[in-house]
Amino acid sequence: PILDFPFKRNGSLVVCLHEDEMPGLEALYKRGITNGVPGLRILNREELRAMEPNISDEACAALYAPTGGIVCPFNLNIAMAENANANGVEFHFNTEVTDLRPVEDGWEIRTSKGTYKTRYVVNAAGVYADKFHNMVSNKKIHITPRRGDYCLLDKTAGNHVSHTVFALPG
């Protein structure tokens, strides 16, 4: 089945509030170019205000990504789970994975509730994804969780900005 969830390509802005943050914005721009993100550009204060009149007066620049878009994460996850279920995926909730090993024609997964063999494993462990990665890869990684805030507004308040707006990380 086809995944059925709404997607809106509205572009995104990473906003810089202080001139001394410009090197961070420029580094983010360069990383985006290296990663092949099309159409990236840095907007000055005037260009940003023209694009988003309600943006903070403190905003001095922004990285604009016209290909950015938004989905409802709840609807997306439900659509993916329904699609996976329709394609025969088995779900094992409240089950801790203790070991993951490659075997002939797939993987052996040892868990708190038994051992399973499968052809494919999807690592969807969020901030714990590094633990699964490190079970099977010689190149070890570490995920450092970050906190952020998303503001969910009433639909009647949804016209204050037209792009997805992020603060410059750091």
Where in this protein do the model-derived segments appear?
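Helical element adjacent to the flavin cofactor pocket in flavoenzyme catalytic cores
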Residues: 63-120
